[in-house]
A protein has these predicted regions:
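Boundary/entry segment of secreted carbohydrate-active catalytic domains
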Residues: 15-48, 57
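Aromatic- and glycine-enriched glycan-recognition loops and surfaces
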Residues: 33-48, 71-95, 138
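Short, acidic/polar
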Residues: 34-47, 133-146, 192-202, 287-296
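Substrate-binding cleft and catalytic face of glycoside hydrolase catalytic domains
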Residues: 52-68, 83-165, 309-314
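A solvent-exposed, charged loop/short amphipathic helix patch at secondary-structure junctions
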Residues: 64-76, 121-128, 223, 264-283
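Aromatic-lined carbohydrate-recognition surfaces of secreted/lumenal glycan-active proteins
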Residues: 103-106, 156-160, 164-166, 173-198, ...
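Aromatic- and acid-rich polysaccharide-binding/catalytic face
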Residues: 142-146, 150-159, 191-230, 249, ...
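Aromatic-rich peripheral "rim/lid" segments of glycoside hydrolase catalytic domains that contact
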Residues: 269-271, 275, 284-292, 296-344
Length: 344
């Protein structure tokens, strides 16, 4: 697979000098989530949707914040998370003219039930930090080698690790140098939309400013288009200012909306057990939110694309999918198709 225009062919201690990339080639991606090997028709379906890049998420596992050990099993888990799945999907993507993005995540065991999240990972003890950073380096370097092997165009070096990113900037600088010694593609980090992306100290060592774009847009029930457009205004201003100051384009490393009533107020919120089988889908708000995003943000000069969350490899018909982030089989899918195909 061919890499993008800005392959990093630089000495190991250098950083990109200007990563403002040709905006006529937007990254139009979805995160593919497949328990089993998807049918041969899956990637052609995404190409017809206008997708240019397929994003695959891999996992490392921590038992808790207090335990700095990171475990990984790249040959187990879901098909799309495995090394073999990445190899096979990248080969099919390449045959279709599609590109691949690898986006490793840490799964913090039980965090959804115990109130823990990966942005809080951090330690008062230096030895604990060193253990975590050693394990994280092993984790990321595995996927740096895999990304180089399969010709992935972009590698996301971290996702929503706010405390580490803020307190341990030198670790991330050193990790970037190490990754670039084995991987020639483009790099970004996926920073949370709140309390993180404007405070990252190593953006200039990366090719994109990566943002998990779950911005609150309106707390009103049944918001109008005007309300949602106004909701984007403050975020657009901040993103534009940061992009201009750092001379880096922005990539929305995640952007998605559920088809539920409060999607504009709490776009990050996952389906709860209480909703399953009781809440009614609101397909209109999901389609509306995507439409406003494309109208208000998509053509901004600082934006280089978005990774939409998410697309199931095998169509799930459970209520969790009906109330989840996927636009598959919902009116939002047609909104995405219209904008993605018109951008090419």
């Amino acid at each position: 697979m061919l890499f993008g225009v800005l392959m990093c062919l630089l000495p190991l201690n250098c950083t990109p000098q200007n990563s403002l990339i040709d905006q006529t080639h937007m990254i139009q991606s979805v995160t593919l989530d497949a328990r089993n090997k998807p049918s041969e028709a899956m990637l052609p379906t995404l190409k017809e949707l206008g997708v240019t890049h397929v994003t695959l998420v891999q996992f490392g596992f921590q038992r808790s914040i207090e335990d700095p050990e990171i475990r990984m099993n790249p040959d187990a888990g879901w098909y799309s998370e495995s090394d073999q799945g990445a190899r096979e999907l990248s080969q099919q993507a390449d045959s279709l003219g599609l590109h691949v993005i690898l986006k490793p995540h840490l799964w913090l065991g039980g965090y959804s039930h115990q109130g823990q999240s990966r942005n809080e990972i951090g330690y008062a003890d230096e030895d604990m930090w060193n253990k975590w950073e050693t394990d994280y380096t092993v984790f990321l370097m595995h996927y740096a080698h895999l990304a180089e092997e399969i010709g992935a165009e972009i590698l996301v070096i971290g996702t929503e690790l706010a405390r580490s990113a803020h307190e341990r900037s030198q670790f991330w600088q050193d990790l970037i140098v190490q990754i670039r010694s084995v991987y020639q593609g483009q790099l970004t980090y996926a920073a949370n939309w709140w309390e993180e992306y404007e405070e990252i100290g190593f953006w200039e060592s990366l090719d994109f400013i990566g943002v998990q774009a779950y911005f609150e847009l309106s707390d009103q029930p049944n918001p109008t288009d005007a309300m949602l457009s106004e909701g984007w205004s403050i975020h657009k201003e901040a993103l534009s200012s940061l992009s201009e100051r750092l001379n880096r384009p922005v990539l929305f490393t995640e952007l998605g909306y559920r088809n539920v009533d409060d999607a504009a107020a709490k776009p990050w919120r996952w389906p709860s057990r209480d909703e399953i089988g009781t809440a009614m889908p609101n397909n209109q708000i999901q389609a509306q939110l995507y439409n406003i995003f494309f109208h208000e943000v998509w053509n901004e000069p600082w934006l280089h694309g978005a990774i939409l969350w998410k697309w199931h490899g095998d169509r799930e018909r459970r209520r969790t999918a009906e109330l989840g982030f996927t636009p598959q089989g919902k009116p939002a899918e047609e909104v995405i198709r219209q904008w993605f195909t018109s951008s090419q």
